[in-house]
Regions:
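Amide-donor transfer/coupling interface in amidating biosynthetic enzymes
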Residues: 1-75
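Conserved active-site and cofactor/substrate-binding residues in soluble primary-metabolism enzymes
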Residues: 56, 75-76, 89-97, 106-114, ...
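Acidic, glycine/proline-rich low-complexity segments that act as flexible tails and inter-domain linkers
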Residues: 73-161, 176
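Short beta-strand segments at enzyme active-site cores
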Residues: 111-112, 181-183, 291
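A glycine-rich phosphate/pyrophosphate-binding beta-strand-loop-alpha-helix module
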Residues: 116, 163-219
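Glycine-rich anion-binding loops and their surrounding alpha/beta cores
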Residues: 138-141, 162, 177, 199-206, ...
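Core alpha/beta catalytic barrel or barrel-like domain that forms the active/cofactor pocket
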Residues: 146-153, 181-187, 249-252
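Acidic, glycine-rich active-site loops and adjacent beta-strand->loop/helix elements
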Residues: 154-159, 184-190, 229, 295-296
Length: 325
């Protein structure tokens, strides 16, 4: 803790838990340190920060904190991992805290892989998916003022080897006068992701939030590259690639559009996900959504077989029904 210039710390009566770490030329106490806990106070004041050594003072503190973080054991995920391994469900609040741990680099790759695998084996609940999605949304780089747009997206992982239908559909909708904030990523467990398609076509995919909003306003469609807007995913991405199986993140991607679109058509890779994901969308505050599964094993609306659909209207979620080509 650093002393504010108008306050005086007396050595007499100083708690035993504190030690003096700095004095001025007259011997007055200027800084103290807790003997047990890494507690710090930083004063951004021109009388200290803008002095000749002010920058070095801040650098020393940041270097120390970085070393402290790098060398500290990463144990925050362990209790949640144990709970899931035992087959116990997480609450929505616990799931959100897990996402905060994952997105903050507080877990080892082995812990992340174990957690994602155990969660899939147990089966993700509606509350768990809602909490994880809420936590991931809070970590995203937001695109403001675009909630009235629509997203057309699929989970991938349907193993159909189809072309990227949702990306193509985004341009059709925009051409018809709609506004599409298309959220997508590179392929992880499927053959081809939205980012792969657009990049191959020469599209600049790494837009800033302002650029993305400008595209949406001018041409009615914008691509929100997950790696640009969910930068904290760098802590999880390598593990997902290594294990190479579907995980809850296949579901979370479509639920975490950085524009927080209130309208969405979302394709899922399995029929048993249609109703639960619709309930999650309602929990997240979406105004209107269609959750779809093509019964010929597509995470899309099929043109060759019936499609299973759940409709979300605010807090109202329909029972699954079929539409046919």
């Amino acid at each position: 803790a650093a002393r504010y210039h108008s306050l005086i710390a007396q050595e007499v009566g100083l708690p035993d838990c504190l030690k003096i770490t700095a004095r001025d030329e007259t011997g007055q106490i200027m800084a103290v340190q807790h003997k047990q806990f890494p507690v710090f106070g930083v004063q951004f004041h021109p009388e200290s920060v803008l002095t000749e050594v002010g920058g070095q003072i801040l650098k020393n503190l940041l270097d120390y904190l970085n070393d402290l973080r790098r060398n500290s054991p990463k144990t925050a995920l362990k209790s949640y991992l144990a709970q899931v391994v035992e087959g116990k469900d997480l609450t929505r609040q616990q799931a959100e805290q897990v996402m905060n741990i994952l997105m903050s680099g507080q877990a080892e790759e082995s812990q992340i892989g174990s957690f994602l695998t155990a969660l899939r084996m147990k089966g993700e609940t509606i509350e768990e998916i809602t909490g994880l999605a809420s936590g991931m949304r809070k970590k995203a780089l937001a695109v403001r003022g675009s909630t009235d747009a629509i997203d057309i997206v699929g989970t991938g992982g349907d193993l159909s080897n189809s072309f990227n239908i949702s990306t193509t559909s985004a341009f059709v909708v925009a051409g018809a006068g709609g506004r599409v904030a298309k959220h997508g990523n590179r392929s992880v467990s499927s053959r081809c992701g939205a980012a792969d398609v657009l990049e191959a076509l020469g599209v600049k995919i790494d837009l800033t939030p302002d650029q993305a909003r400008e595209c949406l306003e001018k041409i009615g469609v914008s691509f929100l590259f997950a790696q640009s807007f969910h930068r904290s995913m760098r802590f999880v991405g390598p593990t997902r690639k290594q294990i190479g199986i579907r995980t809850v993140f296949n579901i979370l991607g479509p639920l975490t559009n950085p524009a927080s679109t209130e309208y969405i058509v979302l394709g899922v890779y399995a029929p048993e996900l249609v109703h639960p994901i619709a309930q999650v969308m309602s929990n997240l505050g979406v105004k209107r959504a269609l959750i779809v599964y093509g019964t010929d094993r597509l995470d899309e609306i099929s043109i060759t077989a019936p499609t299973l659909v759940c409709q979300v209207e605010g807090d109202q979620v329909s029972q699954p029904f079929e539409v046919t080509p």
